[in-house]
């Protein structure tokens, strides 16, 4: 910050070391934010190991708000860890092959509708419980169906999957378009509320 006063610094760290995003004058490291890396891992495990009708609201609340109040954090539902080859995005874990064959308005299925609804719920819960900022990863905001795979020896140095198909989100006949519109409306709402990122978050009741 002494070199670039307007720079934004974000710490990517998994041990939970205190003080990373605390001011230097308070004994911290001075980062502006730290990534809430527990959140995407939690969502992945929850979707993989538990049917959604068994999800615990209390466990979800705890994981989304498990942080130090004096450190600003960046909340996110998923990132490159889930989108790279060998893994699956959250929506792909629910929709699976239907992501390729039933994402048009004329061929939608209960599987795709349920996967889309859960994906929206996950992102809304993650974004609205943030304490600093919310992060999207390229393409995840509209449920991109393919993984990312950069050119390497194992894929013959192919660029085929080193891409995002933005045209899917631009096509109003596809449900990818609806996902992007939801994400856009959610982010605009958050941005419209003054100091949303620092509003107090309280749990009143969990049924």
Describe the residue ranges of each PLM region.
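Conserved alpha/beta catalytic core and glycan-binding cleft of carbohydrate-active enzymes
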Residues: 1-162, 191-207
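Catalytic cores of secreted or luminal carbohydrate-active enzymes
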Residues: 161-195
């Amino acid at each position: 910050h002494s070199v670039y006063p307007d720079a934004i610094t974000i710490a990517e760290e998994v041990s939970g070391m205190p003080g990373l995003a605390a001011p230097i004058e308070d004994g911290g490291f001075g980062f502006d934010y730290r990534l809430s890396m527990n959140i995407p891992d939690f969502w992945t495990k929850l979707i993989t190991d538990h049917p959604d009708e068994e999800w615990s609201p209390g466990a979800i609340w705890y994981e989304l708000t498990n942080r130090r109040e004096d450190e600003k954090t960046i909340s996110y539902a998923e990132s490159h860890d889930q989108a790279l080859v060998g893994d699956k995005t959250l929506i792909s874990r629910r929709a699976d092959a239907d992501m390729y064959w039933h994402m048009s308005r004329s061929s939608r299925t209960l599987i795709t509708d349920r996967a889309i609804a859960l994906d929206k719920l996950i992102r809304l819960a993650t974004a609205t419980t943030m304490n600093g900022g919310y992060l999207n990863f390229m393409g995840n905001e509209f449920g991109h169906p393919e993984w990312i795979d950069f050119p390497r020896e194992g894929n013959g140095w192919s660029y085929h999957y080193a891409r995002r198909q933005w045209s899917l989100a631009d096509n109003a006949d596809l449900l990818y378009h609806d996902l992007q519109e939801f994400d856009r409306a959610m982010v605009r709402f958050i941005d419209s509320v003054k100091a949303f990122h620092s509003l107090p978050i309280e749990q009143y009741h969990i049924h």
